[in-house]
Amino acid sequence: MNKHDFPKIHFYEQDFVDIYNKTWTWLYSSWIDPKTEETIPDGYFIHPTNGNYVIDQFESILSSFFLVYSNRNYDANKNIDYFYSKQEESGAIRWRYDLKTGQPILDSSNPEGVGLPLFAWAEFNLYHKSANKRRIKDVMPILQKYMEWIDATFKQENGLYAAPASASTMFNSPRDNVRYAIDFNAAVAINASH
């Protein structure tokens, strides 16, 4: 696959070791170039649904936490960098983009397209695994502008954030008429602490 081996684990239960090794193999089929629709290591880490190539903020952030362990076989920050490249003048970074058109995917349940603001948490993890100080210097202005947009758009007088419930991506936990969702406000706190 690539020039580096994936990290090896030694565990008394061989079935777990086999699953671990197979997981790295399965990941290869999820690195897709949306323009050519080919599976390539330099593509984006996505799972096409119904022929649509959608990059999701929450999935991209969470995937960076395990991709850092691939010994650079996979780029842990490529998906995140895509979101940074789409930052608007206002500071907005939308939660989903169509990779073929580059356009944000917005709907009536989340007209601003805000996702859980956890980019700083992901960057904190990336820094602790790679010690890339240059990256911190490069992304800090993006993250600051993003948080300024979140404050200006969703922060209320009481200090809490009133984002749409769908921004949490917890569709299996519906909450009608929620105003200050704890998951979104907790994500803001986690993001601010990193």
Segment roles from a protein language model:
Residues 27, 147-151, 192:
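A structural signal for well-ordered alpha-helices, especially hydrophobic packing surfaces
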Residues 183-194:
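Active-site neighborhood of glycoside hydrolase catalytic domains
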Residues 1-55, 75-78, 82:
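Low-complexity, Ser/Thr/Pro/Gly-enriched N-terminal "stalk/linker" regions
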Residues 43-51, 103-106, 171-182:
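Active-site-adjacent structural elements in folded domains
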Residues 156-176:
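Short, flexible helix-coil linker/hinge segments at the edges of structured domains or between repeats
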Residues 8-10, 65-66, 178:
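Second-shell loop/turn segments in exported
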Residues 31-36, 151-163:
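Proline-centered turn/helix-capping motifs that create local helix->coil transitions or kinks
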Residues 53-159, 181-185:
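Aromatic-rich carbohydrate-recognition surfaces in CAZymes
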